[in-house]
Regions:
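Short, flexible catalytic-loop segment of classical short-chain dehydrogenase/reductase
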Residues: 74-84
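Active-site loop immediately N-terminal to the catalytic Tyr-X3-Lys motif
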Residues: 34-40
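A short helix-coil junction within the Rossmann-fold of NAD(P)-dependent oxidoreductases
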Residues: 11-20
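Active-site helix of classical SDR
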Residues: 9, 45
């Protein structure tokens, strides 16, 4: 999730920088919002992805590379990866998420948390003090 992502996005960035610009859209996750105890490595790599895209966007603007970025952060999506596992709250269909992704790219959004329910939840997560967050049981 970390090495492959940074290498792949780095290649795309350099290509667009050399060819007059472009649009890099990446699907990361809401898991990068805060450290999640049930999935520490996953949430850490997703936070890395969010920060890496933010840093590259800043670099692109300062160097006038004309590269746009869209960081797509879905919540739980009903895919084979999640089937047969524990109950996941606010599960979204792949159709719904795909439509939201297309809309975010067309609107050239910088960050798109899919969907409104997850946007509200992650907003709240960001405002929970760390001394409280440490004691919240997520699993």
């Amino acid at each position: 999730n970390a090495t492959g992502f940074t290498r792949m996005v780095g290649v795309a960035y350099r290509y667009f920088a050399e060819h007059g610009g472009g649009h890099i859209a990446c699907i990361t996750s809401i898991a990068g919002t805060k450290g999640l105890g049930p999935a520490p490595a996953y949430s850490a790599t997703k936070a890395l992805q969010n920060t890496y895209l933010q840093a590259l966007e800043q670099l692109s603007l300062t160097k006038h590379h004309n590269i746009r970025f869209t960081d797509i952060r879905p919540g739980f999506v009903d895919t084979p990866l999640l089937s047969g596992t524990a109950h996941f709250p606010m599960l979204m269909t792949t159709n719904h998420v795909a439509k939201c992704i297309i809309k975010a790219i067309r609107q050239r959004r910088h960050v798109c948390v899919i969907d409104t329910r997850w946007r509200i939840l992650t907003f709240l997560w960001r405002h929970i003090p760390d001394w409280i967050w440490r004691h919240i049981r997520l699993a």
